[in-house]
């Protein structure tokens, strides 16, 4: 009998310490039932490549990973294997310098867009960190920003920027010429309280995690309201400060649910699919996960801001 209890105890312990996180899957057709923790980035612990406060994260077509580190005001680039490649940026207001680089996006040409939050501008770079252009000044007018937060690029190269404090989304050409904007502060359709990010799906529809309203809103490419979902809470499809949205190749939508310390996945129409993560500093746990991206192979990278790392997951 004692042997049986020992076997059972060992089995329970193996479940507790497994790196595979079983998720609650309500759509069998989604084929997403669990996510396996792979590793943290960076794995090396040197001052040159240490991440202090990761916020923005994205991947390019070759699988290279770009991380905004607001703790050092620089951008770090890693290979698809997580090996450090290069970094650029420092504190300041000149070209290629930053004051809280919050969001990032890599377009189909490999250009990197950074929302330089406290410099009230967007900067555009080549993939090696070479400065290309910038736009934006402080203010509330067209092409001006108070706190530019998220950035996204559609299939035509148009650039969308969410402005947290102006409570709007602005649309620009690839070189920063203003096209249109929408949004105001409030809780109605098409209104926002701190729009934290902006993302586009394969049809170029626009999605905004409405951080202060604990919901996600969906729009046409020119800002016409389509739908919304989410309420405050801890249940499936509920949020506590949804931060960043990313899409995979199947147009499934991944949302970092910051104060719930988890990631939720939805269809692009807002149907809940699955979730994973809980509060903590262990593998597969999060402390206010800020940003997320999915590469062409379905690998999921989460910028775990307070834990000062990036975590890589694969779906089973």
Task: List the model feature ranges, each with a label.
Residues 23-316:
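Flexible "stalk/tail and boundary" regions
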């Amino acid at each position: 009998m004692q042997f049986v209890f020992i076997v059972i105890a060992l089995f329970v312990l193996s479940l507790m310490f497994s790196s595979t996180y079983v998720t609650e899957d309500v759509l069998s057709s989604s084929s997403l039932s669990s996510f396996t923790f792979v590793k943290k980035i960076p794995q090396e612990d040197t001052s040159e490549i240490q991440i202090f406060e990761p916020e923005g994260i994205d991947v390019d077509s070759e699988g290279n990973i770009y991380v905004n580190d607001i703790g050092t005001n620089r951008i770090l680039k890693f290979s698809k294997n997580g090996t450090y490649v290069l970094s650029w940026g420092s504190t300041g207001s000149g070209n290629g310098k930053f004051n809280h680089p919050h969001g990032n996006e890599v377009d189909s040409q490999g250009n990197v867009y950074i929302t330089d939050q406290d410099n009230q501008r967007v900067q555009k770079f080549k993939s090696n960190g070479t400065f290309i252009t910038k736009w934006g000044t402080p203010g509330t007018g067209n092409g001006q920003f108070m706190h530019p937060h998220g950035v996204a690029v559609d299939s035509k190269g148009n650039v969308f920027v969410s402005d947290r404090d102006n409570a709007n989304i602005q649309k620009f050409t690839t070189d920063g010429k203003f096209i249109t904007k929408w949004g105001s502060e409030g809780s109605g359709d098409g209104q926002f309280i701190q729009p934290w990010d902006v993302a586009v799906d394969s049809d170029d529809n626009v999605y905004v995690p409405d951080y202060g309203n604990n919901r996600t809103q969906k729009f046409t490419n020119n800002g016409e309201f389509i739908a919304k979902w989410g309420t405050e809470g801890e249940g499936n499809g509920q949020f506590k400060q949804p931060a960043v949205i990313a899409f995979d190749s199947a147009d499934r939508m991944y949302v970092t649910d910051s104060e719930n310390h988890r990631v939720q996945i939805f269809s692009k129409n807002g149907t809940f699919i699955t979730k994973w993560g809980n509060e903590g500093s262990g593998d597969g746990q999060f402390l206010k996960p800020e940003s997320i991206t999915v590469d062409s192979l379905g690998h999921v990278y989460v910028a775990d801001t307070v834990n000062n790392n990036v975590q890589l997951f694969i779906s089973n």
